[in-house]
From Swiss-Prot:
Part of the 30S ribosomal subunit. Contacts protein S5. The interaction surface between S4 and S5 is involved in control of translational fidelity. The keyword Transcription regulation does not apply. GO terms for cellular component: small ribosomal subunit. One of its GO terms (biological process) is ribosomal small subunit biogenesis. This is Small ribosomal subunit protein uS4.
Amino acid sequence: MARYTGPQCKLCRREGMKLYLKGERCFTDKCAFDRRPFAPGDHGREKKKLTQYGIQLRAKQTMKRIYGVLEAQFRRYYEKAAKKSGDTRENLVVQVERRLDNVVYRLGFAVNRTTARQLVSHGHFLVNGKKVNIPSYQVRPGDVIEVREKSKDILPIKNAIELNKDKNRMPWLSVDFENYKGVYERHPKLEEVIDLPVDVQAIIELYSR
């Protein structure tokens, strides 16, 4: 299955909620979801009552779209989460939160995950001093993520830092914008990922069927 390359705002409208896929634009009056808060298409305004399966499916689709993950990879994340001890919901969230593209976004070096994925793919970041250009790379506690020296003047990175420098970071991360680096201190707790508008338990139930 190919990665979706169409308008990001259509994904928000399809899921019936803001997924904040376009960064700061989502907070402005240019946000398409604010203007048309219904699904795209001729029947988008019609409200449909979802079955339990439909609710579970929508939860899965929403989480996949937030993190930009395709089905095969997302299923692998679930399978890893299910095999680990502890709360499977939290394990699944950790799997997607520790992706390098997500960590770059969370640290504030990109305005959204899509841009973070592109920046990582183009080799603009180091992990523990070594270049990593795989967006799905799994970051470990204690890993240092930094912008490559020759990439520090790239506009998307400079603009993101300017936008995010006064914002609070997630508690499992630390960042030093002056030196263009951050640390993935530890894995997040489920309750700490406060901006994830998804019933993760519904996803677990869907894959457990």
